[in-house]
Curated annotation (Swiss-Prot):
This is Deoxyribonuclease-2-beta. The keyword Glycoprotein applies. It is an enzyme of class 3 (hydrolase). Highly expressed in the eye lens and in salivary gland. Detected at lower levels in lung, prostate and lymph node. Isoform 2 is lung specific. Glycans are attached at N81, N103, N119, N278. The lineage of its organism: Eukaryota, Metazoa, Chordata, Craniata, Vertebrata. It comes from the Eukaryota.
Length: 361
């Protein structure tokens, strides 16, 4: 009888150990995903604008794609509104987490242009993104697409309003130990959170995100904050976050000087609302005016809602930054951020898109 009880206890212990290990290993799979649904350390995308040439057959849903396992841009065979697109595959993890109602998984979705908006509010940062994580790891998606994504209850879709202009974004997989730093960066960016779930198990380490989730933040917000982050596979990133009290152009006044490099910037340029190229400080900032896709194909920055910058070709420090803010006077009054890397693949990919840029007058 005693032996049977011991055997039963051992079987139970092994079963619990297996389930525990399975839970941890299963939890570790939250990550950026490629179009095959496989985990990748990071990816970046460039959604192409819908151009007026009807003969091209372009829908405004085509995109370029690059990840940690590839060397250069490739044009995806998927469309951005497809669940098999890189965003569809990655966000599938959000819908699974939402359906499971797990207390071990958290998410936070934010956008200054929320889906189905009633009134646009300038109270919050000009910043768009999504985080999904557990106590092992997760991902941070930073993008420029207004009204994206829909709330989890509605599943994956891409907004019709996101077709006309170009859009950009980057997804990075992070271990959980990076989320405390991300938590502080988000406080400064002051995102407009429209869907979130952060169980109490995370509240001890992550102070600000639960407050942002409930819009109850009482923390003092610094004017700006810079932090170093490391992806799950060791890729280094710098994240610049500015609040609405830092009343200056984030590119010229801070990023170029801190990175010690001349920057070529691609942001949404509305006529008579853009800042001119700036050579008044030691490190200069130039506006990109056109993006080339091939020898015979290009589009104007006026058709581009993407937000990125790179070091000028031939300079020592080769940086690429992707983020939230435009080079326009009113954006000095908005909070937001950029994540930057010296990854050579990413730099080469974006550098190859520059057709020409505006010199200083």
């Amino acid at each position: 009888m005693k032996q049977k009880m011991m055997a039963r206890l051992l079987r139970t212990s092994f079963a619990l150990l297996f389930l525990g290990l399975f839970g941890v290993l299963g939890a570790a799979t939250i990550s950026c995903r490629n179009e095959e649904g496989k985990a990748v350390d990071w990816f970046t995308f460039y959604k192409l604008p819908k151009r007026q040439n009807k003969e091209s057959g372009e829908t405004g849903l085509e995109y370029l794609y690059l990840d940690s396992t590839t060397r250069s841009w490739r044009k995806s065979e998927q469309l951005m509104n497809d669940t098999k697109s890189v965003l569809g595959r990655t966000l599938q993890q959000l819908y699974e987490a939402y359906a499971s109602k797990s207390n071990n998984t958290a998410y936070l979705i934010y956008n200054d242009g929320v889906p189905k908006p009633v009134n646009y509010s300038r109270k919050y940062g000009h910043t768009k993104g999504l985080l999904l994580w557990n106590r092992v790891q997760g991902f941070w998606l930073i993008h420029s697409i207004p009204q994206f994504p829909p709330i989890p209850e509605e599943g994956y879709d891409y907004p019709p309003t996101g077709r006309r202009n170009g859009q950009s974004g980057i997804c990075i997989t992070f271990k959980y130990n990076q989320y405390e730093a991300i938590d502080s960066q988000l406080l400064v960016c002051n995102p407009n959170v429209y869907s979130c779930s952060i169980p109490a198990t995370f509240h001890q380490e992550l102070i600000h995100m639960p407050q942002l989730c409930t819009r109850a933040s009482s923390s003092e917000i610094p004017g700006r904050l810079l932090t170093t982050l490391q992806s799950a596979q060791g890729q280094k990133f710098l994240h610049f976050a500015k609040s609405d009290s830092f009343l200056d152009d984030i590119f010229a006044a801070w990023m170029a000087q801190r990175l010690k490099t001349h920057l070529l910037t691609e942001t949404w340029q509305r006529k008579r609302q853009e800042l001119p190229s700036n050579c008044s400080l030691p490190y200069h900032v130039y506006n990109i005016k056109a993006i080339k896709l091939s020898r015979h194909s290009y589009f104007s920055s006026y058709q581009d809602h993407a937000k990125w910058c790179i070091s000028q070709k031939g300079t020592k420090n080769r940086w690429t930054c992707i983020g939230d803010l435009n080079r326009s006077p009113h954006q000095a009054f908005r909070s937001g951020g950029f994540i930057c890397t010296q990854n050579w693949q990413i730099y080469q990919a974006f550098q190859g898109l520059v057709l020409y840029y505006e010199s200083c007058k």
